[in-house]
Amino acid sequence: VGSAPEAGFYQAPTLLRDVPATHRLAREEVFGPVLAAMPFTDEADAVRLANGTLYGLAAGVWTRDGGRQMRMARAIRAGQVFINNYGAGGGVELPFGGMRHSGHGREKGFEALYGFTTLKTVAIRHG
């Protein structure tokens, strides 16, 4: 990977496994190359854990079951849900943004225009 610059704070890519649901890493948004992997018992438990935080920027689901992919994508309260990948896509045509404490509104995509415009209806009767 190379060496980190001497100034600033840098974290090497890190996977933390068996993180308890009550741990700070499971409850806050961690920006950086850090993944907190948490054990779960079934699909409902996984959704409960994913939604058990005040934040909702992004989530990742790994499963081959197409029905489960769609159920979890609908049930998880996050602005983005990645299925069997993480961070793939996300071009300028796709809206980006979070839910709850992760922010309001959207960047990118047609949806982002709503934050910069005001809609108005003008009705004119001629004649």
Language-model regions: role of each:
Residues 3, 10-127:
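Conserved C-terminal structural/oligomerization subdomain of aldehyde/semialdehyde dehydrogenase
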